[in-house]
UniProtKB/Swiss-Prot annotation:
Belongs to the bacterial ribosomal protein bL25 family. CTC subfamily. InterPro entries: Rbsml_bL25/Gln-tRNA_synth_N, Ribosomal_bL25/Gln-tRNA_synth, Ribosomal_bL25_b-dom, Ribosomal_bL25_C, Ribosomal_bL25_long, Ribosomal_L25_dom, Ribosomal_uL5_bac-type. GO terms for biological process: translation. It comes from Wolbachia sp. subsp. Brugia malayi (strain TRS). GO terms for cellular component: cytosolic large ribosomal subunit. This is Large ribosomal subunit protein bL25. Disulfide bonds: none annotated. Keywords: Ribonucleoprotein, Ribosomal protein, RNA-binding, rRNA-binding. CDD domains: Ribosomal_L25_TL5_CTC. One of its GO terms (molecular function) is 5S rRNA binding. SUPFAM superfamilies: Ribosomal protein L25-like (SSF50715). Part of the 50S ribosomal subunit; part of the 5S rRNA/L5/L18/L25 subcomplex. Contacts the 5S rRNA. Binds to the 5S rRNA independently of L5 and L18.
Length: 204
């Protein structure tokens, strides 16, 4: 499991807040933004629409801690909200949240299902019934993994992988469902996938 690559987004301080000025800013190819957080004052920013949209489409901004370069001053931040134009499908505004380097944060991490070729159940024609595609974890910004692996080795038809079976990277722990050993995925028979998943999710 590799840690996330740190993406840098360039931003400039913004002193305009009125609607007309914001509209003019967008026409020039920019996006208004704000960054906020506990212990910090709100800071109004301007982003390059081309640069930010490119990173968004590459999938580098969702559930990632990024480096905000604010007129030469670098800060850690999370993208918390993106507002879209209802007709043009262009980004209208971005909210960031400051992240302190030494703090522990909550973040959703995607699950990656590995070793399907080592699952006898899948070799026999079983299908994956994925019940959970991401989990919320706690970790410091420098420990955020790109994904968390779910090992399917040895799994037969009718068997499940529960959250207790998933090995978390060092420095990463569950943020939610800490007392609930919920089902992540089952190997279901191709002709009875629904029935198999219902049985497995009720098992303790």
């Amino acid at each position: 499991m590799t840690q996330q690559e740190m993406i840098t987004i360039n931003a400039e301080l913004r002193d305009v807040t009125k609607t007309k000025a914001i509209r003019s800013l967008r026409k020039k190819g920019n996006i208004p933004a704000v960054v906020y957080g506990k212990g910090h004052n709100n800071v109004n920013l301007t982003l390059s629409a081309k640069e930010f949209t490119k990173q968004y489409k590459l999938g580098f901004l969702s559930a990632h801690v990024i480096e905000l370069d604010i007129s030469g001053k670098k800060e850690y931040a999370l993208v918390r909200d993106i507002q879209w134009h209802v007709v043009k499908d262009t980004i209208q505004h971005v909210d960031f949240q400051f992240v302190d380097k030494g703090s522990e944060i909550k973040i959703d991490i995607p699950l990656s299902f590995v070793n399907e070729s080592k699952s006898p159940g899948i070799k026999l024609g079983g299908v994956l019934n994925v019940l959970c595609r991401s989990i919320t974890v706690k970790c410091s910004p420098d420990k955020i993994p790109q994904a968390i692996e779910v090992d399917l080795s040895g799994k037969m038809i009718g068997q499940s992988v529960h959250i207790s079976d998933v090995k978390l990277p060092g420095g990463v722990k569950l943020a939610a469902h800490e007392e609930e050993n919920f089902t992540v995925v089952t190997i279901s028979a191709a002709d009875s996938g629904v029935e198999e998943s219902q049985v497995e999710t009720t098992e303790e």
